[in-house]
Amino acid sequence: MTFLAPRTYLEWRTNGTDRAEDAAYAFGKDLIVHCRDEVLSTLAPDVPEATRAVVQAAVDTALHNVLDMLEGFWRLPSGPQHSLEYVLQVRVRDASGTIVESQEIAPCKLDLPIGYWKWARDREFR
């Protein structure tokens, strides 16, 4: 399967929203390759297609729900007077390990749950 690779850091666009989107695409590629693909690769080659489809759907639902949670789709109570919010930030480090840029991509920045399907189904990271 072919995929459209995300831009490298030096190729990120300069507009603020576009730059955050480029960071999100980098995250999306890593989520798909290191989480989704890694799990699906553990299935034996002779697993029936119906079983493979059920496992793939379960993995997609779980990862999509993580993105929903990061986007603030659900209220996450922490006692009677407080709630929680999870934040996803992409940090770029140079060769020496120094942070050169940070982009907050969730919550409520780029609609990651919609992006998930583009990443998982189309392998498109731009």
Which stretches of residues belong to each language-model region?
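N-terminal low-complexity, intrinsically disordered segments
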Residues: 1-53, 80-82
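Acidic, proline/glycine-rich low-complexity IDRs
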Residues: 2-10, 36-37, 41, 73-126
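Mature extracytoplasmic domains of secretory-pathway proteins
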Residues: 45-68
